[in-house]
Amino acid sequence: TLISPGVLARENDQSFIQNAPAEFGAAVIGPTVKGPVRVPTLVTSYSSYINIFGGAAESGSIDYGYLTNVAANNYFRQGGTTLLTTRVTHGSFSSAFTSGSTAGSGNSGILNTATSESFQLETISEGAIMNNYQAADSANGTLDSGSVDNVRWEISGVNTGSGTFSLIVRQGNDTATQKNILETFNNLSLDPFQDNYVEKAIGNQKNTLRTDSDGVVYLQTTGSYVNKSRYVRVKQVLRPTPQFFNNAGTPASSSAGIPFVDFIPVAGSGSFISGSGENFPSATSPAKFNENITNGNIQGLTATDYSSSISLLNNKDDYNFNVITMPGLTNNFAAHATQINSLVSLAENRQDCIAVIDVQAYGATVSAVTTQAATFDSSYAAAYWPWVQATDPSSGQIVWAPASAFIPGVYSFTDQSSEPWFAPAGMIRGALGNVIQAERKLTSSQRDTLYSANVNPIASFPGRGVVVFGQKTLQKRASALDRVNVRRLLIAVKSFISQIADNLVFEQN
């Protein structure tokens, strides 16, 4: 510090070590039993995935597991940490919500009196599967249509003196004596000026997929408060507490003392109604799963159902991942080819991920696989073959699944055990421990043919199991970038440099 006139020289050491760059995980696009529709959602464990997106799907009285589930389970079992999941559906879907003004044990409305609603909730998950309304609870407080995949609400701890209450989110198939509590929000208020206001405490934001006049797909967010519940959000507050009351329930002015009991909800439990959208619409019924997937039936979906989700994930500023897949689509089906090419283009445009694709359906020949692989030329895409057999974690059945459902897990294991620039292949890093067997036991000659066509073989070795035995990209020109580990090295380096350089964008040159 100078007191008399002079020149003060200062130094600022900027040679400090930056924080380690963030590492990103995988992305998967596909159908799930429940969850937000076409809203990319980050999950950090398989149990979290099941809570949000559900497990087995029932079609024709048989439980099936979506390939999305198989991919998620394998990814986390292989050491994956973050999975960006985008649920795809066929047709229009909407959330279920609370509504009704008639008191009763099975009432769907959250009432403050016998004939008036206090506020409304709606489920974050969309589809008719979230509906569980019935006129009255069955024995022991159960809901006939309550299931492991939907939820119910309960109001408790009502304090008419302070104007507070608790909201409990329960699993849809629990009972009055054995409640399965998913979330609890205590000390809630209907006073918009309080920190514990129900919309602030639970959240009221909703994401809707939009397409602007330029054809750009984006998510539009409505609502002022971030959702803190994984299952519900506040749809609207119908009877907010008048702002002239304080937290003690007494008038803050000379206004008439209207009691809190006229506004806050009464104790009780209820259900949700009016969710729309079927996982297996009549247009694609019965749904075709696993090796039975066809040109126009991909687990109850069509290929065009994937288009908007692919477009949305092109935005690298909003969504981060280093590998992306959509198991169930294979390039040999004409109706699937556009979406598979779009996925490859996504990876090329983003330049921060590899698209793992499947070029042939179950039961193909080596020559058919190489023919389909020849239609691609990109260092940002990789193909693996043949299909493999594994236990579906949601249905418990042994199923056939394409290689793309397992490769993100191999990449993740490589990242955890080594580094991204190590080859994600071989007896150790390429081991598919969750796989029972490969569709074909490839000979050395067949592996050579596949590798010459830039298809990575899934090989079987006695005593060693099933392993990924190749690491080529689909680039045709022979160069360093026709190897997966080199492409992943450059992706990692560019990502690290970009994250550090972002802090310097507006600094002086």
Residue map of PLM features:
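Structured, hydrophobic secondary-structure cores that serve as assembly/anchoring elements
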Residues: T1-S118, V158-S166, R170-A176, F193-Y197, ...
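Charged, amphipathic alpha-helical segments
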Residues: S4, R10-N12, G55, T68, ...
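Conserved aromatic
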Residues: V43, L182-N187
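Surface-exposed loop/edge segments in extracytoplasmic proteins
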Residues: T175-E183
